[in-house]
Amino acid sequence: MTESVLDYMTRLGRAAREASRVIGRASTAQKNRALQAAADALDAARAELTAANELDLAAGRANGLEPALLDRLALTPARIDGMITGLRQVASLPDPVGAIRDMSYRPSGIQVGKMRTPLGVIGIIYESRPNVTIDAASLCLKSGNATILRGGSEAIHSNRAIATCIQRGLAEAGLPAAVVQVVETTDREAVGALISMPQFVDVIVPRGGRGLIERISRDARVPVIKHLDGICHVYVSQHADLDKAWNVAFNAKTYRYGICGAMETLLVDQRVAERFLPEMARRFQEKGVELRGCERTRALVEAKPATEDDWHTEYLDAILSIRVVNGLDQAIEHINHYGSHHTDSIISEHQGEARQFMAEVDSASVMLNTPTCFADGFEYGLGAEIGISTDKLHARGPVGLEGLTCEKYVVIGDGQLRGQGTC
């Protein structure tokens, strides 16, 4: 009798739960040994990885996959090198598990502190890019979590080949293969099952398009770490150094159009707009960036009319919305109304103004004189990241190793009894 998708996912979930107890108590040395061995296995399996990836690319071309998606799907030699380097980098990162902080004596004589512990089992749902398999698996492994990886159907052969290398590394370190499992069915019912197993899965991390993330957020019976959009702003204040502002705003938009930290809306104080915008527009237009502006913007530079929808849009493309605002308060109001709580930056030399912006803008990252494209786990010193969260519960901003752990209280006494002495 053929196993149903639900039975298959239940089997994966049960195995992951059992494996989480093993990896959760594994030593740092054992986890690092698994990561290094997995890197060696990837290096030795380049031919197998390339062959598996070619199957996915051929299927993608046959199915009319767009060139940009085919590019994301490709495992080039450089990308395989990057995956190997990524595994070794995660192995070199400090292990957050077991770290104790804030130990202090209470009047009763007991000591109270907090210890970092793994979350347990993490389900990762993602699209296209097979290198996400390595990023997710390595971070979950190092943070003491088991993981179930459900990649896009277009990368199924690549993901299987990568998972085989990871499991070789786990075996060499004496850890169960179920610490990292790839869902090997392309049936979409598997996603529904994965997000509906709170008895086996502790948290879901979706990485992909808005439709995928909205569906998971709506239907999941398991907590979700996510962000929907990256509608990031740069505000050029009346106290900005304009040379700095031109460079920062240009980099924020053009570093890479397709990342969630790219600037999508530029806000400019009305008192500097006439001096700032013509040169800024010239630079963007030379780069081929399409400008969409409010009426005050269009009175100063050539731009298409911006609509209400533009302020709500994450373009992920060479398109930029520009609005001239009355000042700091209106800029903050605009960001909090239209933004996605991801990353927003102010360009200013005025400390009080910068402090107000950072205190009142409701985003996971707030920046001063810095392009929003710096919103990245590597740039923040976290090493690799599993994603960026715009939620306020558990993790916010780039989610690295520590974001894949939680805290429990540690209480140490020497026979103290409550209700006696100073209690």
From Swiss-Prot:
Pathway: Amino-acid biosynthesis; L-proline biosynthesis; L-glutamate 5-semialdehyde from L-glutamate: step 2/2
Task performed by this protein: Catalyzes the NADPH-dependent reduction of L-glutamate 5-phosphate into L-glutamate 5-semialdehyde and phosphate. The product spontaneously undergoes cyclization to form 1-pyrroline-5-carboxylate.
Pfam families registered for this protein in UniProt: Aldedh
Record EC number: 1.2.1.41
UniProt KW Cytoplasm keyword: yes
NCBIfam families membership: PRK00197.1, proA
Source organism superkingdom: Bacteria
Source organism: Pseudomonas putida (strain GB-1)
Compartment list: Cytoplasm
A GO biological process held by the record: L-proline biosynthetic process
GO cellular component: cytoplasm
UniProt lineage: Bacteria, Pseudomonadati, Pseudomonadota, Gammaproteobacteria, Pseudomonadales
Protein name according to UniProt: Gamma-glutamyl phosphate reductase
Chief location: cytoplasm
Catalytic reaction equation(s): L-glutamate 5-semialdehyde + phosphate + NADP(+) = L-glutamyl 5-phosphate + NADPH + H(+)
